Amino acid sequence: MLVCGVDEAGRGSLVGPLVIAGVAIKRNRMRELKSMGVRDSKKLTRKARESLYPEIVNMADSYHISRVPPGVVDRSVGRHMLNDLEARYMARVITRLGHGTTYVDSCDVNPRRFGGRVSEMSGRTVRSYHRADDRFVIVSAASILAKVARDRSIERLRKSHDVGSGYPSDRRTVGFVRGYYNKNGAMPPFVRRSWRPARLIEAGG
């Protein structure tokens, strides 16, 4: 019997995509996942995540990674529907994984409501929890896939742009966005214009 986990990475990022990853693995292999050292990606070093990524992929019965472009994120933020966007993409990922109970990390203050949305959209049994990436090893595995995929997206950008970590708390990131805007009179296509730092820069702040 399969168990599925879904998580995101880059939700708060100013630069780059929102990444949704899902993985399906046989229930009787959950202990094996734990013994490999799989846990919440935020508690692992980048080197550890990169090392675990191929191991998780090789163990998985199926997995899927979806990248939501900044422009799509911006349109959802403009309609105050970022949670709905995440639910929709999670549902799409779930339908690619095969049948099995799916655990998701809730971005909604009400996990039951969020799980209900994802379940309705995917037609699958979905259990939604806060901190699911810390509570369920299958979601931890998904969080590692999402985080590595997001980091690789940023690395590709770094080859031609000094974007830093991509997060708005990073002065290097904000400095790059401001410098690019001042030079070109427009935001880079990989920046979320709906995020406060970008709006302030466009407003002359």
UniProtKB/Swiss-Prot annotation:
GO terms for biological process: DNA replication, removal of RNA primer; mismatch repair. The keyword Nuclease applies. Belongs to the RNase HII family. A divalent metal cation binds at residues 7-8, 105. It comes from Cenarchaeum symbiosum (strain A). GO terms for molecular function: manganese ion binding; RNA binding; RNA-DNA hybrid ribonuclease activity. Its EC number is 3.1.26.4. It catalyses: Endonucleolytic cleavage to 5'-phosphomonoester. The gene is rnhB. Its cofactor is Mn(2+); Mg(2+). This is Ribonuclease HII. Keywords: Cytoplasm, Endonuclease, Hydrolase, Manganese, Metal-binding, Nuclease. Manganese or magnesium. Binds 1 divalent metal ion per monomer in the absence of substrate. May bind a second metal ion after substrate binding.
